[in-house]
Regions:
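PLP-dependent class I/II
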Residues: 1-126
Length: 126
């Protein structure tokens, strides 16, 4: 029995309209994400005894390495961060064994949310 999977037609028309329509919003999103990325990098730099990272060039996600001994178990580290610091992150182990000792952070949130999260992380570990 032949079987094919493709994007729904309505989604294809929506994608075409988005690509052919005004692109002003793309510049605005790019500027916002760059500023948010830079803010998160500054905040991570301030916690360089806790995290090591590489600055992302094409994603709104970061995957810093946890340098603390308790970071070897990323699941436990993230649960502790959620319970004691009220900061939600994704444990690196969720992305496979090489993700252990890392956590995933997203900077597609408002600047005040980034600052609030890092203020809480700082209070917990510094």
């Amino acid at each position: 029995m032949p079987f094919a999977i493709c994007a729904p037609v309505v989604s294809q028309y929506a994608a075409l309209a988005a690509l052919e329509g005004p692109q002003d919003c793309v510049s605005e999103f790019k500027a916002h994400y760059l500023a948010a990325r830079n803010l998160m990098c500054e905040r991570l730099d301030d916690l360089d005894s806790i995290f090591a990272y590489q600055r992302p060039d094409g994603s709104y996600l970061m995957f810093p390495k946890i340098l603390l001994a308790e970071g070897k178990d990323s699941m436990a580290f993230c649960k502790n961060l959620l319970k004691k610091g009220r900061v939600s992150t994704t444990p690196g182990i969720a992305f496979g064994p090489t993700g252990e000792s890392h956590l995933r952070l997203s900077f597609c949130v408002p600047f005040d949310e980034i600052n609030k999260a890092f203020d809480r992380i700082r209070a917990l570990f510094v």
